[in-house]
From Swiss-Prot:
The lineage of its organism: Bacteria, Pseudomonadati, Myxococcota, Myxococcia, Myxococcales. Has three domains with a flexible linker between the domains II and III and assumes an 'L' shape. Domain III is highly mobile and contacts RuvB. Residues 1-64 are annotated as: Domain I. Residues 65-141 are annotated as: Domain II. Its main location: cytoplasm. One of its GO terms (cellular component) is Holliday junction helicase complex. It comes from Anaeromyxobacter sp. (strain Fw109-5). This is Holliday junction branch migration complex subunit RuvA.
Length: 197
């Protein structure tokens, strides 16, 4: 089983990346959050991997963080949620935010995520509350991120351009250290370059 891949980003798609590891290109399915956190094409990337073996295919799912992988693995244990659905859910909500919503039985918040209806949200709360409790406690109460100013404007601009909030958050956070003294348009160009890979 493959647990981790490290290599060059050969290409990026809407929901996947091809990672060149020793001359072999691995197609790895990713959430929007993990995809946004990867460097542009040609850069070095490292992903945690879940290998899904089906009768007709072997699929690799990648994660930029241990938390996202843990939530993904918990999601696929829920009846009716397969790897693709779990990936789509994690593209619509951050792993820690999902854990907090489940821990708080926030069905209304969960139903705002594309692909989660009321019944699925209720099932997630019932089946995952204990599994995700530790992660939700580690996340703590929802808190404002430091350095709101131009980084928050960048995040909002990306959402206005059609990027999902988790994608916009990841891209804006990746540029947080570079934000000081830069104008919004400069940061927006850099964020778009990274998102398009």
């Amino acid at each position: 089983m493959i647990a981790r891949l490290a290599g060059k980003v050969a290409e990026k798609g809407a929901d996947h990346v091809v990672l060149d590891v020793g001359g072999v290109g691995y197609l790895v399915h990713l959430s929007a959050v993990s995809l946004a956190g990867l460097p542009p094409q040609g850069g070095d990337g490292t992903l945690r991997i879940f290998t899904n073996v089906r009768q007709d295919a072997i699929e690799l799912y990648g994660f930029a963080s241990e938390d996202e992988e843990a939530v993904f693995r918990a999601l696929i244990d829920v009846k009716g949620v397969g790897p693709r659905a779990a990936q789509n859910i994690l593209s619509g909500i951050d792993a820690r935010e999902l854990a907090q919503a489940v821990a708080g039985s926030d069905v209304a918040r969960l139903t705002k995520v594309p692909g989660i209806g009321k019944k699925t949200a209720e099932r997630l709360v019932v089946e995952l509350k204990e599994k995700l409790a530790l992660l939700a406690r580690a996340a703590g109460p929802a808190r404002a991120k430091p350095g709101a100013g131009v980084v928050e404007q960048l995040r909002q601009a990306l959402v206005n351009l059609g990027y999902k909030p988790p994608q916009a958050d990841a891209a804006a956070d990746a540029l947080r250290d570079e934000a000081e003294g830069k104008k919004l348009d400069e940061l927006l160009r850099e964020a778009l370059k990274r998102l398009r890979g």
